[in-house]
């Protein structure tokens, strides 16, 4: 499904998505047109889902992170859709166990957090909630560990 060159290209793009194609080609030792074709195929296959800018949440008065564990009554599809529609909600994960969902959200402060929780509480399917406020984020990434795929890393 992947070869070593694909893995190397993916490692480079995960490090810096805006790197010029010519630089990727130089690093993998291929012609820019061949690298561009590989990247296009990785995109078509859904391996590369997209490219995005990571913003500093504190610069937008969203420095407070919280995780909300939500127990549901079984109407999970409707609950997931409703949770996903809340702008401060960044992630919605359906989980195994007594909780139906684990939700990550960002907001300005505790007052705003309380308002968002008041939006969540009456949603269809929500039975109970437990909230954990993040004191400090030690690591946060969307990178995929490619060393498990090919057994080694170039870093």
Sequence positions of predicted segments:
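A compositional/biophysical signature of low hydrophobicity enriched in polar/charged and small residues
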Residues: 1-155
